[in-house]
């Protein structure tokens, strides 16, 4: 709740590793995260130019380990630092089943199968702070992930995001794609 972490296993069952005990590094890890930030920001409707202009960065916030039965009931993330507008979860390769994620916003939901190819590759999910999301129970194995705050480090003079004039084409494209998706899926989620 807020900056405090309450322990209630009916709401959330996951191991959290203290960041002071974690070093995330590798030959190209920083470049990999920067690439994921750019791609996920674009998928959230932010142009590549605005990713640079706004100085969008991912700041490591938590390292989580879900064991069998691990889950997190529907919730919205709280703002943890200035400029935070969303969350990026990078799932590291580990073998598990279950643990699908549901992300909802304004009556629309999308389910992500996080266990697909989980043992051989890392995956990511990103969402805005006003999206409700949950992690369904792990049915077997261990799910290991890094949780980052998506942060604007260089806001413009009017606020965090630039004016929407440059995003009109993106909004129109997203509306068309959403309409096609709804027609094809008849409103089904999955």
How does the language model describe each region?
Residues 3, 14, 135, 168-171, ...:
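Intrinsically disordered, low-complexity regions
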Residues 153-190:
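Eukaryotic intrinsically disordered, low-complexity regulatory regions
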Residues 2-70, 76-79:
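Signature of the catalytic double-stranded beta-helix
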Residues 42-53, 77, 89-90, 134-135, ...:
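Intrinsically disordered, low-complexity boundary segments flanking structured domains
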Residues 56-59, 63-159:
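Catalytic core of non-heme Fe(II) oxygenases with the double-stranded beta-helix
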Residues 32-36, 40, 84, 131, ...:
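Alpha-helical interaction elements in eukaryotic regulators
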